[in-house]
Amino acid sequence: KSNELLAHAYSKLYGIPCTGLRFFTVYGPCGRPDMAYFGFTNKMVKGEKIQLFNYGDMYRDFTYIDDIVKGVSAVMEKAPDANEDGVRVKVYNIGNHQPVSLKFFVETLEKCLRKAGVIDNEAEKEFLPMQPGDVYQTYADVSELEKDFGFKPDTPLEVGLTAFAEWYAGYYRRK
C-alpha cells in the first residue's frame, strides 16, 4: 500500500504517470521455490507430509505466469488517464479471479505431478486448524483491467499446473 501512496504523491507533485500492479499467487514453470506450490511439490517428491490449514478450506486466486506476463504487456501499452484530481495513477489487479480451495489446488497439483511422472505416491496431507493472522480467502477483482485493456487472465488451473509439472520433471531430471 505504501508504494501506491508514494506513486500517487510523485504523480501529483511531478506529473509522472504511474501504474501499479497487484499479482495474485503467481505459479508456473521456473517459479519461485519459496512459494507454496513449489514447497508442496518438493514435499510430495520427498514423501513428506503437507500441512493444509483451516482443513484445506482456504481460498486463493492462483494465477498462471503467462497470464501475468500478458497483463503486464497490456498495461504497458497505455499510461493512465488523469483522475478527478488530475493525478495519472491507476492500480490493477492481475489474478485469475476464480479462487479455489487449497485442498482442491493440492489435489490438482498431485494429479498433474503424477501424470508428468514426477511422483507415483499418494501425497500425505495433514489437515490443521486455521493459523492466527491467516486470511480465509483472497481473490482479484479484475474488472478495471478488463474495462481498460480488454484483458482478464483465463488459464485454467489444471493447464497451468500441468505446464509446471512437466517443467519440474524435465528440470529436476537433468540435475
Residue ranges and their predicted role:
Residues 9, 31, 37, 69-70:
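Hydrophobic alpha-helical membrane-insertion segments
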Residues 1-4, 31-38, 62, 99:
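Short-chain dehydrogenase/reductase
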Residues 16-36, 58-59:
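Flexible, glycine-rich beta-alpha linker
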Residues 42-175:
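C-terminal substrate-binding subdomain of Rossmann-fold SDR/epimerase-dehydratase oxidoreductases
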Residues 1-19, 41, 45-46:
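Active-site Tyr-X1-5-Lys
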